[in-house]
Design a protein with these regions (language model features):
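Alpha/beta catalytic cores of group-transfer enzymes, especially the acyltransferase/condensing modules
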Residues: 10-12, 37-39, 100-251
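Short, solvent-exposed amphipathic alpha-helical segments in soluble enzyme
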Residues: 22-23, 147-149, 182-184, 285-288, ...
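A short, acidic, amphipathic alpha-helical segment used as a generic capping/interface helix at domain edges
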Residues: 250-267
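Non-catalytic positions within long, well-ordered alpha-helices that form the structural scaffold/packing
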Residues: 77, 182, 263-266
Length: 312
């Protein structure tokens, strides 16, 4: 068996996530509490109850998701379950790097909190958006974006799986590209409930802020390979983690390529770490049954996974 950990991104968060894991697994609780200490708000309250309704805001979503990942990773590590490879969708990449020992999970939470604030600040005051495009190939959608460029910035920002791409940019240009995509044969275009054009050139100021932040961070060597969003594969010898993370926030997430690369590397089993099962769905659509993917969000799912892994 070759195992990959896949860390979820923004969009699958919900109030109550991680609460039963926190109450059931001491290792989850300890790692979660340590991670929560890295931010300037009550992270546990936002994750478990979200009374103020802020969990959907990116500056809160990102560190909350990362703390959840820290807890689950700690339980798996305690049980002797560690991956051969790791990858994470968007903000999940920080958790993947922490799992690989590049920095600790508390640093990952602090960095994703900073990243969330930088992305929110970059998006503020701009009329931007993102739209999922279903049932159209990459080449055709790229042509639609090029034709809509007279309305403003628009580009493909997520390459999720076959038949599911996401475009982002200035709203008028995104709307125009979506109309052209429907005319070109797209099955549906679904506007996403997000506050900015993430993973597009419009996030350049956030990339600049991250580059400056990274100057104070020590990046240790990876204990195992991480596949990077902006590449769709492992880093090259002349790449640096800091440069790739800076690039990631302002360029497309190549998730389908990442999943296909995992199969080339011999991965046959994956654990989705995060609320929901979005990545499990993407894996299934990209490579079918070549990778058995186990989503883990609840204590019951984790107990079942531990039994499965011990029997493997």
């Amino acid at each position: 068996m070759k195992l990959a950990f896949l860390y979820a991104g923004q969009g699958s968060q919900h109030a109550g996530m991680g609460q039963d894991l926190y109450e059931t697994f001491p290792a989850f609780r300890a790692a979660f509490d340590e991670a929560a200490a890295a931010v300037d708000f009550d992270l546990k309250e936002v994750c478990f109850t979200d009374a103020a309704g802020v969990l959907k805001e990116t500056q809160y979503t990102q560190p909350c998701m990362t703390a959840f990942a820290a807890g689950l990773t700690a339980v798996l590590r305690e049980q002797g379950i560690m991956p051969d490879y790791a990858a994470g969708l968007s903000l999940g990449e920080y958790s993947a790097l922490a799992c690989a020992g590049v920095f600790d999970m508390q640093t990952a939470v602090a960095l994703t909190a900073f990243r969330g604030k930088a992305m929110a600040a970059t998006a503020a005051g701009r009329t931007c958006g993102m739209t999922a495009v279903l049932g159209l190939d990459e080449t055709s959608l790229q042509a639609c974006c090029s034709a809509a460029a007279e309305e403003g910035v628009v580009q493909i920002c997520n390459y999720n799986c076959p038949g599911q791409l996401v475009i982002g940019g200035e709203k008028a240009a995104v709307d125009k590209a979506a109309d052209l995509a429907l005319a070109a044969g797209a099955r549906r275009c679904l506007p996403l409930n997000v506050s900015g054009a993430f993973h597009t050139l419009l996030m350049h100021p956030a990339g600049d802020a991250l580059r400056e932040k990274f100057q104070s961070i020590h990046f240790a060597p990876m204990q195992f390979p991480v596949l990077f969003n902006c590449l769709g594969h492992e880093m090259a010898q002349n790449d640096t983690v800091a440069t790739l993370l800076e690039k990631q926030v302002q360029s497309g997430v190549r998730w389908e390529a990442t999943v296909r690369r995992l199969t080339e590397l011999g991965v046959d089993t994956a654990i989705e770490i995060g609320p929901g099962r979005v990545l499990t769905g993407f894996v299934k659509k990209a490579v079918g049954n070549a990778i058995s993917c186990y989503p883990v969000e609840t204590a019951a799912q984790l107990q079942q996974l531990l039994c499965t892994m011990k029997g493997a």
